[in-house]
Amino acid sequence: MLNLAVRNTGKLVREKSKSENIRLGRLFTKKETARLMAAMLRLDTERTAYTVLDAGAGTGILSAAVIERICRECPSCKQIFITCYENNEDFLPMLKDNLERIRKKCRHDYNVRLYITVYEENYITESKNHYTVTFFDSVEDKYDLIICNPPTELYEKDSQEASEAGGVTQVKIGAPFLFAKMAARHMEDGADAVIMLPATAASASSLTGFRQEMKERVSLERIHLFIGKQKNAKRAVPLKKNIILSYTKGAAPEKIQISTSYDEGKPESTVALPPLDYNFVVDEADGSLTLPKSIEDTKIVSYISHFPETLSSLGLKISTGLVIDSRCEGLLFSEPIKGAVPLLRQSCINGGVTTFPMPVKRQYIAAVNPTLIQKNKNMVLIKRVPAKSDERFLNSSIYMAAQLPSYRYISTHNKINFIDTKDKLSEMSARLAWGLFALLNSTIYDRYLSIVSKSKQINSKEMKKLPLPPRNIIENMGMRLMAAKQTTVAACDQIVNPTLHIIEK
């Protein structure tokens, strides 16, 4: 059935390409991706009938994949009710032809009756017009299985589509998110929905409302990640632009299953990762997703997550640098003048060492505003935004107050974060600062943060939650690193890995 739909769709693509020079291939789901999406749906082999929704059906490739799987794996199922929404006139004839051929194949090969409904309408705006009348009320049609690879166009905030879906706050929103919101409303209790969404759905701050609404209505159950090529072996593996999310209408599972592939989802190249706790993958506050991309990633996350301490429990805090250049015009100087204090910029962070002064401009600030200066204390500095040339995601350096003994106060630039004591009157001990730096400069912590980070920069909120070993272990590592008098990643790894019982490859 799936082969039939894909073969016929290929003919349509070739015809349009020749006659109208329209390239439609990118609009349709690849065969292996369709089979993968259908496989992510849970099926009950004892069930005798299924209702299926394919919203934005195109030529029926996803419909074919679901119907084929039900027929093959559910011998008790004798009836399938398929509903398709499609309003593209180029696709409708092929959709109807494919479904009719599939109907005959179901009857002939599997003795299954396939009942077909095709709505030549916009799913987002018109689905509310199709409902079931009950004794007490009329409710919108609901389905046991929903599968959807939506179109990619953008809708304005005041468009009819955004209005029907509701809860849209951004100026523009992609159609896939509106399709997902509508699909969540059309799920029966215990139903499953598998939807292709842009990878931005996992963490984009503008989609917080979307994720929270989905979290309230349905529970995430499975995730498939399409992995891109890794240009820098020392940086995190990149995601391609789409991910597949599988939702269920019911209680959240204890574990979420994540799988990955480098292609369109062929079985031989798909890797299933060890299941992860639901509360780890799905953030309780904003619904954002943490997405490990390999078995090694899941091992690192599982190991680090069990450490007992955080910055707060150690009496520490992470803050963003105080100075933004555009707000301090007239206060910044390239050379030291009377009343000015050093301004530590991200260029000072180099190879684990904080170097000052540097051959850069505007590295001193006049101490005229108390909100722009801080006490000269031991700190760990972190680049907020890694440069493309950086080999690591997390770039940190150790700063000792004794480096600038003639200054009681210094300042920090907004493009760095700094770790300091919560108590303004106290100071981090040298061994604690060096131990913390050893952890942050190690390979395993760089990997961990690149896995759990939901943005391309170091987020102080994520750093506050960073699991850390007990204080005595951190201080012990700090003393050993101080004795080694080195700040390289290799030196930190030589101390951190044996201490934390991490076995290197």
Where are these regions (language model features)?
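Class I S-adenosyl-L-methionine
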Residues: 1-78, 83-102, 127, 203, ...
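Glycine-rich, acidic and aromatic/proline-enriched surface loops and short helix-turn segments
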Residues: 7, 149-152, 442
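Signature of N6-adenine DNA methyltransferases within the class I
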Residues: 22-23, 27-36, 57-64, 79, ...
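Short helix-terminating capping/connector loops at secondary-structure junctions
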Residues: 46-48, 73-79, 107-114, 138-141, ...
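Conserved acidic residues
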Residues: 50, 144, 379
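Catalytic micro-motifs at enzyme active sites that drive phosphoryl/nucleotidyl and oxygen chemistry
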Residues: 71-72, 107, 131-137, 228-235, ...
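S-adenosyl-L-methionine
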Residues: 97-135
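Polybasic, glycine- and aromatic-enriched phosphate-binding surface used to engage nucleic acids
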Residues: 299-483, 489, 493-502
